[in-house]
Amino acid sequence: MAGGRRGGRAKRRKVCYFTSNGITHIDYKDVDLLRKFISERGKILPRRVTGTSAKYQRKLTVAIKRARQMALLPYVAGE
């Protein structure tokens, strides 16, 4: 199995949610938006999963951390 994919469908390129919707500022108080980028365990989802660009992934990380600090989002998921 040296290199390449075996059968299956070709991988579709993910599009950045923020650039496609024209969002330039990510607000830490917009909890509903931030929850889309957090796993059910409370972890921040990586770029390769969400498809966000590097610029907006950095802004998203800062916004999520601020929301956690202000107790708008949990650090870990509840039971």
From Swiss-Prot:
Q: Which GO terms describe its cellular component?
A: cytosolic small ribosomal subunit
rRNA-binding listed as a keyword: yes
Q: Read off the HAMAP family from this record.
A: Ribosomal_bS18
Listed GO MF terms: small ribosomal subunit rRNA binding; structural constituent of ribosome
PROSITE patterns membership = RIBOSOMAL_S18
Q: What is this protein called?
A: Small ribosomal subunit protein bS18
Record text on subunit structure and interactions: Part of the 30S ribosomal subunit. Forms a tight heterodimer with protein bS6.
Which of UniProt's keywords are assigned here?
Answer: Ribonucleoprotein, Ribosomal protein, RNA-binding, rRNA-binding
PANTHER family for this protein: 30S RIBOSOMAL PROTEIN S18, SMALL RIBOSOMAL SUBUNIT PROTEIN BS18M
Provenance organism: Bacillus licheniformis (strain ATCC 14580 / DSM 13 / JCM 2505 / CCUG 7422 / NBRC 12200 / NCIMB 9375 / NCTC 10341 / NRRL NRS-1264 / Gibson 46)
rRNA-binding in keyword set: yes
Q: Function of this protein? A: Binds as a heterodimer with protein bS6 to the central domain of the 16S rRNA, where it helps stabilize the platform of the 30S subunit.
Similarity comment: Belongs to the bacterial ribosomal protein bS18 family.
The record's Gene Ontology biological-process terms are: translation
